């Protein structure tokens, strides 16, 4: 079992708006002067875009038939944040997980992030990474509203367990005529003095087309953010050789590392929408959204392999007298007898594993939808749509050079560690001195510059890796409006088909010999591959270092590509296809006392995975197939206590399926992280059944109070097991992978999640007005 403690220092920004311009034709025409107004009198009219957007969001939330929370763009179409994760993170019950300080994943009410689905205009979109929907690749500039549904209804896919984030794209019909909106801004990151830039533009117009009307909207956005980040990470483990009294509760740091980043992140988006309303009862819409997230990252990684020689410690269950010993016969790792503890101690002559990595990471989503809404006869409505989405996750690495300590103990560092402060991974480095009669080790002179230690080049890896997911969706919904039990009701019957295919293509050039290094033009001495650049971060590390030269890495990579051939990583290549046939029945009834929504969704899921596997020493294609039928009932009741207060009760269900890479019938090897991950095509989805009880009070002039409780019972919880691989079956190219960390997905029994949520949004004006402000 492995545990990780980490700390990350991120950028803070000082930003300012350069310009923001809006032109709205036909919206703000100057009113004609009335006869009783003097010609020299000036009339001033005002608008409050932010207040208007908040009011619109609260109105949508109040009128919703299930539990939702909404972020709406202001009257000129702006959300206050750069990406969807940041914008949604302002809403109650929405937490964001960050990478390098930037909001990336969304968790609803404390649930796992893969329980949250992403959709554009109601169509679920597969993230480039898979079921863990990433929201940092989606600029908020494309959205007019963000609707977060916390209670699942039958028209939502069954994989929506904790909720859905629905990005409502802009339409020309959001505006009364010609509309132009542009924004530009810049700022500076204080850590590392890095610049950031932002800009967006939206143009739309409406045109008469016979008896109907056509609306056209196009938009684009760009965001760039330079960053310097620094961190430390500590991975803990149980050590089998530590058998002394109290060992059951002791977890030792197997390694500690610093990751020091220089990076630039960019977002682009382009969207277009064509809406045609031939008459008041028919609408046909073509929508397209293309987003790109690019991360150019240079990472200097120093990993101190504290458990490098843990087998030197003899397992002994007897109690010992604890006494400081600065000349042990072993490394001192996990040895309580010499005075070492989990959080303080000294380890003698251990390995430094240094990585210099230059990445050109890129993710994109290209989603296209053709949809139509048609009202016919009396009370009948037909909605149809077709969607194609292609998501790409380009994980390629320009180059990664590995520099490792030699096997000679006296050429390796002695490391003194102090982890008592959880915010600092304090280290001190020393030379290692070997004593004789018997052989013992002690700390020599203190070392500040880590690059004075011998760390010859051990490998150079160039990776080309692209994961492509192609998804097709077809949906047909027939609705009937009618009277029901004294109220107005809408009954819906729908069918939906989804097919998603994820294909992984991965190959690499891996150089490990001196002759290959010479051909590629990379020096074996790190100091000849580094810059004379002082540390740009601020985290205290206990040593100094030199950044690697990114220009030299690009040159070496280009030379290696010309002289060596990429070899497919067959163990990491797979093709997984998922088909979902779904049907649902639901009813929505509105009464004087409130409303009710209920129904059932049935899904038949078919999975097929193809990969290269090794069976009895023979490698070849392996195909695994599975199928299952799942039923998802739900019921939501909304009671109007009065015109301003609502009580919401709901029961809902869902099923979180394992991610596509977890369903593959093979294993994936990552030499950089020394990890192996395996697929499990037979793993079952985790089923969730939940209840919610919420009270909402909408207050004047504008605001609301909300409090509620929620609970979910989960069956067949998806559990990621982690252990030491313990086999030489995957050893190759003189690389021993038996000690790598192996992880795989499995079902781990039942569980539950429950909690309490409260939120308040109030206007300060009634109080500030009384103060004369």
Describe the residue ranges of each PLM region.
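Extracytoplasmic beta-strand/coil segments of soluble accessory domains associated
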Residues: 85-124
């Amino acid at each position: 079992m492995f545990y990780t403690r980490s700390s990350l220092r991120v950028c803070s920004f000082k930003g300012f708006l350069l310009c923001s311009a809006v032109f709205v034709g036909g919206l703000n025409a100057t009113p004609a002067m009335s006869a009783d107004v003097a010609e020299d009198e000036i009339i001033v009219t005002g608008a409050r875009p932010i207040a208007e957007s908040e009011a619109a969001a609260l109105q949508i939330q109040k009128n919703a038939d299930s539990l939702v929370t909404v972020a709406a763009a202001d009257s000129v179409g702006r959300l206050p944040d750069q990406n969807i994760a940041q914008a949604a993170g302002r809403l109650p019950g929405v937490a964001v997980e960050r990478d390098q300080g930037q909001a990336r994943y969304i968790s609803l009410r404390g649930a796992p992030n893969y329980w949250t689905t992403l959709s554009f205009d109601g169509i679920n979109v597969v993230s480039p990474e898979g079921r863990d929907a990433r929201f940092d690749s989606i600029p908020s500039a494309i959205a007019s509203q963000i609707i977060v549904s916390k209670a699942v209804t039958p028209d939502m896919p069954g994989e929506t367990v904790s909720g859905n984030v629905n990005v409502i794209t802009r339409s020309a019909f959001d505006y009364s005529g010609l509309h132009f909106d542009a924004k530009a801004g810049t700022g500076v990151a204080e850590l590392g003095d890095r610049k950031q830039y932002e800009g967006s533009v939206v143009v739309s117009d409406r045109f008469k087309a016979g008896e109907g009307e056509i609306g056209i909207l196009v938009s684009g956005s760009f965001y760039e953010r330079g960053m310097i980040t620094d961190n430390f990470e500590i991975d803990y483990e149980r050590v089998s050789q530590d058998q002394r009294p109290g060992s059951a509760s002791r977890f030792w740091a197997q390694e500690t590392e610093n990751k020091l980043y220089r990076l630039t992140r960019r977002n682009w988006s382009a969207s277009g929408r064509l809406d045609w309303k031939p008459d008041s009862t028919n609408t046909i819409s073509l929508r397209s959204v293309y987003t790109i997230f690019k991360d150019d990252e240079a990472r200097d990684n120093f990993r101190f392999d504290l458990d490098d020689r843990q087998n030197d410690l003899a397992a002994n269950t007897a109690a010992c007298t604890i006494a400081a010993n600065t000349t042990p016969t072993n490394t001192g790792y996990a040895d309580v007898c010499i005075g070492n503890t989990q959080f303080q101690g000294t380890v003698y002559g251990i390995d430094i594993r240094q990585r210099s990595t230059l990445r050109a990471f890129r993710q994109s989503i290209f989603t296209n939808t053709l949809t139509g809404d048609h009202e016919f006869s009396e009370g009948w409505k037909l909605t149809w749509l077709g969607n194609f989405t292609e998501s790409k996750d380009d994980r390629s690495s320009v180059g990664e050079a590995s520099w490792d300590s030699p096997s000679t103990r006296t050429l390796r560092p002695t490391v003194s560690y102090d982890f008592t402060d959880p915010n600092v991974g304090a280290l001190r480095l020393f030379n290692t001195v070997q004593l004789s009669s018997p052989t013992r080790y002690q700390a020599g002179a203190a070392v500040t510059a880590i690059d004075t230690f011998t760390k010859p080049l051990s490998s150079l890896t160039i990776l080309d890796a692209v994961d492509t997911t192609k998804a097709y969706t077809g949906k047909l919904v027939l609705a009937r409006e009618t009277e029901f039990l004294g109220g107005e009701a809408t009954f819906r019957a729908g069918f939906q088909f989804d097919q998603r295919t994820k294909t992984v293509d991965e190959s690499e050039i891996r150089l490990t010999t001196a002759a290959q290094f010479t051909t590629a033009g990379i020096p074996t001495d790190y100091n000849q591959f580094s810059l004379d650049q002082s540390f740009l971060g601020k985290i205290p590390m206990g040593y100094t270092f030199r950044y690697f030269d990114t220009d030299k890495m690009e040159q070496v990579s280009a030379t290696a590509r010309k002289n060596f051939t990429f070899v497919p990583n067959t163990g990491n290549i797979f093709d997984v296809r998922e088909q979902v046939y779904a049907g649902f029945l639901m009813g929505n009834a509105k009464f004087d006392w409130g409303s009710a929504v209920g129904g059932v969704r049935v899904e038949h899921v078919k999975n097929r995975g193809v990969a290269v596997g090794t069976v009895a020493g023979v490698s070849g294609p392996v195909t695994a197939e599975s199928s299952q039928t799942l039923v998802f009932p739900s019921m939501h009741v909304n009671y109007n206590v009065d015109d301003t207060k609502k009580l919401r009760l709901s029961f809902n269900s869902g099923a979180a399926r394992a991610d596509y890479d977890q369903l593959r019938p093979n294993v994936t090897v990552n030499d950089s992280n020394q990890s192996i991950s395996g697929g499990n095509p037979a793993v079952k989805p985790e089923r969730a059944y939940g209840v919610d009880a919420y009270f909402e009070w909408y207050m004047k002039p504008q605001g609301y109070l909300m409090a509620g409780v929620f609970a979910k019972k989960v069956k067949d919880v998806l559990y990621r097991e982690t252990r030491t691989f313990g086999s030489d079956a995957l050893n190759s190219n003189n690389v021993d992978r038996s000690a790598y960390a192996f992880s795989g997905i499995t079902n781990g029994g039942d569980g539950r999640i429950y909690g309490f949520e409260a939120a308040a949004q109030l206007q300060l004006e009634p109080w500030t007005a009384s103060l004369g402000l």
